[in-house]
């Protein structure tokens, strides 16, 4: 992957947040981790068949560095690193680099 095509983004790990009443709900850690990746809109016949109308909310991320990511982690794509992530990882495919599919979080 060409270095000049990579841009900085911020990864926020998923976690379980416990409120003061003992309720548990999913959330993201506050400390962002900077990564460099290439992100582009999803396209193609296969992804159109898989996601249908959700395709407008899907991005493809190409990543070839060492930071470990899991499905459900958040990525700050169009928001600053201090805010909640606007995309989450829904699929990780391992080739010579990682092809990661991101889906827009609509609660942002």
Predicted segments — roles?
Residues 1-40:
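Extended boundary segments
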Residues 25-108:
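Short, conserved turn/kink motifs that form compact alpha/beta structural patches or helix kinks used as
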């Amino acid at each position: 992957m060409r270095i000049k095509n990579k841009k900085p983004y911020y990864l926020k790990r998923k976690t379980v947040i416990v409120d003061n009443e003992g309720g548990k709900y999913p959330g993201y850690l506050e400390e962002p981790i900077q990564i460099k990746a290439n992100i582009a809109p999803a396209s193609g016949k296969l992804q159109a068949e898989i996601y249908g109308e959700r395709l407008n909310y899907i991005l493809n991320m190409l990543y070839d560095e060492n930071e470990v990511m899991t499905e459900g982690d958040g990525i700050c794509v169009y928001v600053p690193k201090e805010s909640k992530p606007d995309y989450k990882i829904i699929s990780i495919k391992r080739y010579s680099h990682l092809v990661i599919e991101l889906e827009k979080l609509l609660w942002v």
